[in-house]
């Protein structure tokens, strides 16, 4: 894996936030075709994050700088349409929100090309296989072939997001960043302890990422959740740069780390190379 500084540091990093959602919406004042109510509704949806799944009206208003009355109307509309629910005080998103991005993610060239490859890998390995890209500080699942057995508490599907620092695909993608982009990531990322095994400091993660650069693959062993062991490899673009990651997730009680490397790694590398070849040749 090439970690030269010639890569565009913004290829995988989050774009800088230059204004609050409310300020960005205000910039379109005077445009007769701009729907402020729709823009506010989308801003309310984006206010929810993995670490803040339950928010009050006041919290959403603070995050977006949209007036509370407008936030309340947006939430009421989203509830009526089945995108949001409430316990009387806080609000949270419902799974229907995933449909907003699922159609796009599932129809991208990479997703369409990756799906049959993942299906074949999943059938060969009898484990769930996925492809993801880096979106801000998280990995975004764009294709997945699941198995009936759920591996973690979150039901993963196309559009799901997980923290990059403690997932195998995330570390593949972080290892592909140049030094400047990686520095920016560590300055803003919220590195939480998920299990007793989680590498959650820059000092521990940097040597790990350097090893990934050298060997070209990554195993994460029960750092996101106890029992989850996963292996990931890079998916390269036409110039040989990392554009995505492909992984297989297993339960630690079924598959040893040695078996992941011995039996699963060759098949996963072959799958990622096939995906790159079909996309760019």
Where are these regions (language model features)?
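Juxtadomain coupling helices with adjacent low-complexity linkers
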Residues: 244-281
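Short hydrophobic beta-strand micro-motif common in sensory/regulatory domains
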Residues: 229-233
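Short, solvent-exposed recognition segments
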Residues: 2-24, 151-224
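N-terminal helix-turn-helix
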Residues: 2-112, 273, 277-281
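Amphipathic alpha-helical effector-binding/dimerization core
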Residues: 90-188
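Sensor-regulatory modules in signal-transduction proteins
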Residues: 235-238
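Short, structured helix-loop boundary elements
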Residues: 34-38, 94, 107, 111, ...
């Amino acid at each position: 894996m090439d970690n030269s500084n010639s890569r565009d540091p913004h290829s995988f990093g989050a774009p800088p936030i230059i204004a609050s959602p409310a300020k960005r919406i205000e910039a379109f004042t005077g445009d007769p075709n701009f729907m402020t109510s729709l823009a506010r509704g989308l801003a309310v949806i984006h206010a929810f994050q993995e670490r803040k799944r339950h928010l009050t009206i006041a919290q959403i208003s603070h995050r977006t700088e949209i007036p509370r009355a407008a936030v309340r109307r947006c939430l009421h509309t989203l509830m009526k349409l089945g995108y949001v629910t409430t316990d009387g005080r806080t609000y949270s998103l419902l799974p229907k929100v995933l449909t907003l991005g699922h159609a796009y993610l599932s129809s991208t060239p990479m997703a369409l090309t990756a799906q049959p490859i993942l299906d074949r890998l999943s059938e060969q390995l009898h484990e769930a296989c996925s492809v993801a890209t880096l979106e801000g500080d998280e990995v975004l699942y764009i294709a997945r072939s699941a198995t009936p057995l759920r591996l973690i508490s979150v039901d993963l599907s196309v559009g799901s997001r997980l923290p990059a620092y403690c997932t195998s695909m995330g570390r593949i993608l972080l290892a592909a960043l140049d030094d400047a982009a990686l520095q920016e990531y560590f300055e803003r990322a919220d590195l939480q302890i998920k299990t007793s095994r989680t590498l959650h400091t820059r000092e521990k993660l940097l040597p790990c990422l350097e090893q990934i650069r050298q060997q070209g693959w990554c195993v994460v062993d029960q750092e996101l959740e106890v029992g989850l062991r996963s292996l990931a490899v890079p998916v390269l673009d036409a110039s040989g740069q990392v554009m995505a990651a492909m992984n297989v997730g297993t339960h630690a009680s079924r598959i040893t780390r040695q078996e992941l490397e011995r039996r699963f790694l060759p098949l996963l590398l072959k799958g990622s190379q096939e995906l790159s070849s079909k996309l760019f040749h």
